[in-house]
Amino acid sequence: AKDLGMTTVTVGGKSVSMKHVALTIGTYPDSMFGVHGAGGGPHPDWVSYSSSNLVVPAHSLVTMTINQYDSGGPLNNPFFANVFGTVGGTATIDGKVVTKVDPSAVGHTFTLRGIPQNTTPLFVSVPLPENFATDTPLTIGEGQYSKPVVVTFSFMTGSKGVYNWNCEFPCGGSRIGQFGEAMSTYGYMSGTLTVK
């Protein structure tokens, strides 16, 4: 995470000073962008996030930017078209502040949740709209991509712990409900957030 210094936020009606960090990741229609190895690794055609293991400080404000390069479609569960757990209950998509997106045009989601041994509950879920662009002017690694849909949001961490995140859009293929392949293989559409 990139250190942005200290910031003041309102928590429970009180001003609180806390560390502010930034993370930037991407979602891709394939694995050709670099992190899975030359030629896209063992599954070059699988959708993927650019990073699996994210690390941020405890008791901090985290501002995430997700560059969404992939197409999409309808969610299995429209619940995940809503923004949850962010500062103000909002996300900014290509400069527009939103609380939800069209559930029939989602590319992926970033859905973060606690695991049982964590003492601090945390649930953040942000829909990443479908990228309708058809041109591919950007070269990243060995892949060709369109200009991304840029999604930005912030959330606050509590005490130390490890949290799981994943995509809730059915983008994996192969199994019933499209939750196989990339969706069921760690490091493609899932990962961890370690709060230190």
Task: Label the predicted regions.
Residues 1-102:
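Extracytoplasmic entry segments of secretory-pathway proteins
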